[in-house]
Amino acid sequence: MKLGIVGLPNVGKSTLFNSLTKAGAESANYPFCTIDPNVGVVTVPDHRLDVLGEMYNTKKITPAAIEFVDIAGLVKGASKGEGLGNQFLANIREVDAIVHVVRCFENTNIVHVDGSIDPLRDIETINLELIFSDLEVLERRISKTVKLSRNDKMAAKELDLQNRLKAHLEENKMAKSFVTEDEDEQAWLAEYNLLTAKPVIFAANVSEDDLADDGVNNAGVQAVREYAKEEDCEVFVVCAEIEEEISQLDDDEKSMFLEDLGLEESGLEKLIKASYHLLGLISYLTAGEPEVRAWTIKKGTKAPQAAGKIHTDFERGFIRAEVVSYDDLMACGTHAAAKEKGLVRLEGKEYVVQDGDIIVFRFNV
């Protein structure tokens, strides 16, 4: 999974990225200190892996991973070349979802590019830049499709879609709110890889004082929550400065620090939950002495396709899957005991893999 972190200059975007990835990306109180995208990979915390590692006396534990891309700060007119221009747009097209850091804190020492704190205005600024960029992409496609449509029925059908989509974007609407039931049109939309079609998670960056109550008394946070609900986005509240402090601590110190702040989980854990929920992701597990590993798949994935995450041969030559749920295995204590109780199942090609399934795939190529 690849997430792009975006936001206006000086909203705490790079500070948050630093704390999430401990990559030490330069962060300073002036616009565009992140000129090239910084990339960091973080592991997804999953207590089940450690438990299985002990049970199987495993030599290696490999958690799922998320790749974060810190993309240079935006200003109005970025799609037309203002600020850093289109540099950020190419980088963001490759991500699975966008994490939009929104400033919901007051601090006279940190300037805001528009001179005041207004989360919804900031969201609109970035949305418009993404829309303008998508319109440019669409207009280039339309110019090609027009020529083809004169002698090609499918091209004519695609041109009709492109014109409807263009009108939709010109009303300052995001591509993800454009609805079509037609399978051809759905395939074309996916091919366009439009920025405004990507899922969005808002990171409401607050001061330490607003962290313990999850921003309930912060008007900016509440405004972002209402907006996100309307737009079918996820929101989590974070204090980037606190996250940066947390990133310097070991696990025991981190737990004590969070407890002192009245928090149950870190911002990273909130973000991972939000991204898994928004993208409809789950993890299945493989376990044995050589390695215990988590594999990330979409909800609804069938066994052969889940096997393909490990290797294409597993999917191509899939025979069956030997499955036991994590909870059943824990209740029984050992794989052998779970097998005795009939809790280890043999599943075929139509089996839909569940979160926490521990699977051994049988295949032949």
Model-derived segments and spans:
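Conserved G1/Walker A P-loop phosphate-binding module
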Residues: 1-111, 139-140
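C-terminal-of-GTPase-core extension/linker across diverse P-loop GTPases
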Residues: 2-6, 17, 144-352, 359, ...
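Flexible interhelical turns and helix-capping residues at alpha-helix boundaries
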Residues: 9, 131-134, 193
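Phosphate-binding glycine-rich loops and adjacent basic patches that engage nucleotide phosphates
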Residues: 12-17, 45-57, 85-109, 121-130, ...
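Short, intrinsically disordered, mixed-charge
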Residues: 22, 54, 90, 128, ...
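Glycine-rich, flexible loop/turn motifs
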Residues: 23-31, 38-40, 48-51, 80, ...
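Amphipathic alpha-helical transducer elements in NTP-driven molecular machines
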Residues: 32, 46-49, 62-68, 82-96, ...
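Conserved Switch II/interswitch segment of TRAFAC-class P-loop GTPases
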Residues: 40-45, 72-82, 93-155, 168-182, ...
